[in-house]
Amino acid sequence: IVLFVVAADEGWSAQSSDHRDAVKALGISHGIIVVTRSDRAPERVTTVIAEARRELADTGLADAPACGVSGITGEGIDELRHELDELVATVGTPSPHDNVRLWIDRSFTIDGAGTVVTGTLGAGSVRVDDELELVSTRHGESEPREVSVRGVQSRGASEEVVEPVSRAALNLRNIPASEIHRGDVLLTPGAFHLTRVVDVRSVSGDSLDDVPRETTIHVGSAAVTARVRPLGAEHARLTFDVPLPLVIGDRLVMRGTGERAVLGGVRVLDVDPPELRRRGAGNARESELEHMSEHGDARREIERR
């Protein structure tokens, strides 16, 4: 779910266009258009909503509900809560029994507590004293290492357990904050295959034939470099400079390495694809990918291996 925010007194901006491109690249179809600071320009709320709808017409938010709100007066907040309740009711809830994969967006030290990391828990549960695996997404970093959870906080309060979907702050034992960086990821030990090569399908309608041969890939809070080998207009093979804990169905955003423009979005089809060595192997693989499910096919994978 995304809240697409545009300020009433500023209107659509270059940053709004970047957000629109990311929404399209990720294939997001659940969201609300929120025009903030309505108290500063109440006469512009309707105009800005109409402008946002025009800009989002080619995305999954074309028919999203919209409302104007003010954090100063409280106007529109109740309507926004209602729209959020309605929207959340239509979206499935991740299982607290799934494997944990928490992409880290911050790490810091608190006196008397030690290292703390924050991120969004999208699936699984984290409890005090859990053992997790820390994987770095920085080039040249060491192998995955085990860490222990000393404490858990969510929404500003200490908890024994945090379940999805939640913002979480985890106090970790025996590791300095300086050795953890944005984009690193905490995992259920042994639950994820770390891969450098994946096959993907375009989900944004952009041709992968036109993508530069080297791009920046965004997944979770990580940004890594990848080499791109197109396999037709809709499919490609990505080779990362570091191993990543990806699964079939993951959505990735592709951006230019220089101008940083959003190039498109892709969904992972295979996290352990076959090598393409023989003449014509690329064309044959393109044909295979056209028939592959974005949710995985266990029987097909067993037969292939």
Feature roles, as predicted:
Residues 30, 40-45, 51-54, 65, ...:
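C-terminal effector modules of nucleic-acid-centric enzymes and ribosome-associated factors
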Residues 38, 54-206:
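Conserved catalytic-core segments of large NTP-driven translation/proteostasis enzymes
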